[in-house]
C-alpha cells in the first residue's frame, strides 16, 4: 500500500467515526477529568514551564539544486531528516517543531529550557546544512519554493481513492480529513460528489484573499508557545483571567508577520497601501480565517474567561467537533481514561487555552498554553517571552494585581489592536494603583516589572530576573519589534525605487541573513546596533 493510499484510508476512517457518539464520550470523560481535579490529581508542588517552537526550512544555496535556484526559498524537509533532527512534523512539509522537556519555574529551569533549545537547534542546523537548508524562526514565510508560486504551493491538491489530499501537507489524518468533510461535519459521498462553494477554505487578511480545497494555507505561519503549569489546578481560572489581560500587550511586543508572499495580495493593494493598512501580525488573520471557515462557530478566537475550573473542562468537552478522530488505543497513559476528551484539546483552538493531561498520575497537570506569539528572530528573544509569561503568571495572581478588573471586552480589543498596529496600538491597562491608562511606557513598566517580580519569587536573583526580561524592555525603549524592523526596511527599499515584490523578498533575505548570525547565541537588539 502506498503512503498516499494509507493516508486516504486514515481519512476515511476518521470520517466514519460517529460524531454524536464521539461527543457523548467526550462529555462522559469530562466527568472523569472533573473527578480527578477534585482528587487533586492535577496538582503539583510547584509551577512548571514548557515550550513549543515552530520553524520553516529554506534553502541556503550551498548544495542542492533546489536551494541554489532561489536564495532562502522555502524548502520541503525530508521526513527522515526530521527524525535525525529529533524534531516533530507540523502542518506543512516545510515545517519542523521542537517541544522542550518541562522544567520547574526557576532560574535553573529557564536556563535548562534555553540550553535545550540551543543544543537541539544547533544540532538540527548542522543536519539541515548538509542538505543545503536552514531552519528559520519567523512568523510567516514570504519566499515560496524555487520554481513554484506561493499560491501553487498552498493550494495544490489531488484526489487519492476519492479523498482530497494536500500535496504539500504532512501526513496528518486530521488536517487532511478537514478537506473531505462538509461544513456540517459529514463526509462526502464519494469521489464524484461535487464540492459546494462553501466547503472551500478561504484565507482572509487585510489585502489578501486565497481560496483552497484544504487547510494548507495555515502552513504560512509559525509560532512559539510558552506553557505554564499551575501548582494547584483550582487556581487555573484566576491565572487564565490574567493571561487574557496580558495577551494584547505581549503580542504587541512580539509581532513578526507584517507581509505575505507579494503575489498573494489583491490587485488593488500596492506597497504603499500594505504599509498604510496592512496588519503587523497577519498570523492571527491566517489561523482564524482558514480554520474558522470549516466550522459553524469560530473555534479560533480570543476566549471567554471562566471562574471555576470545571467550567473550563465543560467548555472543552462541548466545543464544536470538526473531525471526531478514532480512539488510537494501545498506550498505557494516565490520561487514556479520558482519551477522547484529550483529543478535543487538539482542536480547541483558542489563543489562550487550558489543557488537562499527563502521561502518568504523577506528571498530570493543568496548564495554560499561550498561543498568540509568532516565531521570534532569536532563541534568546523567544525564551524572553517564556520567562515574561511565566513571571507574570506568578506575580499577578500572588499580588492580586488590579488589571484583573479590566473588562473582558477591552482585553479582547487590546488583542486585536496589537494584531493591527503592534507597539503603535493604543492599549488599555489598569496599573498597580488601580488607575486605567493608555500610556505605553506606564503599561510596560508595570507589566515587565511584574514579570521580573514573578521570576524573583520563583528563585531568580535580581540580576537574573532582569536578564531574562531585558530583550523585551529593549523593544519598548526603542519602539522596535520584528514587524517594525521589516516594515522599515520595506519602506526604505520602496523609497529607493524597488517594486513591492523585490522590497519584501530582499527584506526577508536580510532577515534570514541576520538570523543566521544570531539565532542560537545572539539577540534581536544586535540587528539594529543595540546591546
Regions found by a protein language model. Name each.
Residues 101-109, 223-229, 368-377, 431-436:
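Glycine- and acidic
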Residues 2-214, 220, 363-366, 383-395, ...:
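Terminal catalytic/cofactor-binding subdomain
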Residues 371-464:
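Substrate-recognition/cap regions that form aromatic- and gly/pro-loop-enriched pockets
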Residues 64-67, 107, 236-238, 296, ...:
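Short helix/loop capping segments that flank catalytic or ligand/cofactor-binding pockets
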Residues 59, 102, 139, 182, ...:
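Short, flexible loop/turn elements at secondary-structure junctions
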Residues 128-137, 248-278, 395-418:
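Flexible helix-coil linker/hinge segments at domain or subdomain boundaries
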Residues 457-531:
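C-terminal amphipathic alpha-helical interaction region
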Residues 142-365:
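Loop-rich catalytic cores of soluble enzymes, especially ATP-dependent carboxylate-amine ligases
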Amino acid at each position: 500500500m502506498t503512503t498516499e493510499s494509507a493516508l486516504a484510508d486514515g481519512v476515511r476512517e476518521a470520517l466514519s467515526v460517529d460524531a454524536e457518539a464521539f461527543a457523548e464520550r467526550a462529555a462522559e470523560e469530562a466527568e472523569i477529568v472533573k473527578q480527578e481535579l477534585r482528587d487533586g490529581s492535577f496538582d503539583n508542588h510547584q509551577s512548571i514551564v514548557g515550550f513549543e517552537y515552530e520553524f520553516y526550512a529554506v534553502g541556503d544555496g550551498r548544495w542542492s539544486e533546489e536551494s541554489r535556484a532561489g536564495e532562502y526559498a522555502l524548502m520541503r524537509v525530508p521526513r527522515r531528516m526530521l527524525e535525525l533532527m529529533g524534531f516533530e512534523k507540523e502542518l506543512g512539509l516545510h515545517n519542523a517543531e521542537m517541544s522542550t522537556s518541562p522544567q520547574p519555574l526557576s532560574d535553573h529551569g529557564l536556563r535548562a529550557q534555553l540550553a535545550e533549545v540551543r543544543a537541539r537547534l544547533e544540532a538540527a542546523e548542522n543536519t539541515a546544512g548538509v542538505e543545503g537548508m536552514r531552519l528559520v524562526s519567523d512568523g510567516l514565510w514570504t519566499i515560496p519554493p524555487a520554481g513554484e508560486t506561493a499560491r501553487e504551493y498552498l493550494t495544490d491538491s489531488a484526489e487519492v481513492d476519492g479523498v482530497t489530499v494536500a500535496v504539500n501537507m504532512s501526513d496528518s489524518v486530521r488536517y487532511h480529513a478537514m478537506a473531505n468533510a462538509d461544513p456540517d461535519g459529514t463526509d462526502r459521498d464519494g469521489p464524484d460528489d461535487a464540492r459546494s462553494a462553501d466547503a472551500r477554505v478561504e484565507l482572509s487578511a487585510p489585502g489578501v484573499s486565497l481560496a483552497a480545497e484544504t487547510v494548507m494555507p495555515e502552513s504560512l505561519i509559525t509560532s512559539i508557545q510558552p506553557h505554564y503549569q499551575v501548582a494547584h489546578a483550582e487556581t487555573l481560572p484566576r491565572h487564565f483571567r490574567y493571561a487574557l489581560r496580558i495577551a494584547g500587550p505581549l503580542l504587541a511586543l512580539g509581532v513578526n508577520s507584517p507581509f505575505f508572499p507579494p503575489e498573494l495580495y489583491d490587485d488593488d493593494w500596492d506597497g504603499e497601501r500594505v504599509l498604510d493598512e496592512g496588519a503587523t501580525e497577519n498570523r492571527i488573520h491566517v489561523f482564524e480565517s482558514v480554520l474558522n471557515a470549516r466550522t459553524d462557530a469560530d473555534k479560533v478566537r480570543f476566549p471567554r474567561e471562566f471562574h471555576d475550573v470545571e467550567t473550563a473542562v465543560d467548555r472543552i468537552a462541548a466545543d464544536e467537533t470538526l473531525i471526531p478522530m478514532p480512539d488510537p488505543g494501545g498506550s498505557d497513559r494516565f490520561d487514556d481514561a479520558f482519551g477522547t476528551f484529550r483529543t478535543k484539546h487538539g482542536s480547541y483552538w483558542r489563543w489562550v487555552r487550558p489543557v488537562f493531561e499527563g502521561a502518568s498520575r504523577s506528571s498530570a497537570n493543568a496548564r495554560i498554553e499561550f498561543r498568540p506569539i509568532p516565531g521570534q528572530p532569536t532563541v534568546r528573544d523567544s525564551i524572553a517571552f517564556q520567562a515574561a509569561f511565566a513571571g507574570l503568571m506568578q506575580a499577578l495572581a500572588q499580588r492580586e494585581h488590579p488589571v484583573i478588573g479590566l473588562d473582558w471586552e477591552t482585553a479582547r480589543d487590546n488583542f486585536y489592536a496589537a494584531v493591527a498596529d503592534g507597539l503603535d496600538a493604543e492599549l488599555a491597562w489598569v496599573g498597580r494603583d488601580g488607575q486605567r491608562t493608555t500610556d505605553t511606557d506606564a503599561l510596560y513598566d508595570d507589566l515587565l516589572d511584574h514579570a521580573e517580580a514573578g521570576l524573583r519569587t520563583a528563585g531568580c536573583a535580581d540580576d537574573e530576573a532582569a536578564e531574562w526580561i531585558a530583550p523585551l524592555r529593549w523593544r519598548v525603549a526603542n519602539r522596535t519589534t520584528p514587524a517594525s524592523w521589516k516594515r522599515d526596511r520595506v519602506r526604505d527599499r520602496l523609497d529607493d525605487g524597488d517594486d513591492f515584490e523585490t522590497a519584501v523578498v530582499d527584506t526577508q533575505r536580510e532577515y534570514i541573513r541576520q538570523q543566521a548570525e544570531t539565532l542560537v547565541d545572539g539577540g534581536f537588539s544586535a540587528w539594529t546596533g543595540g546591546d
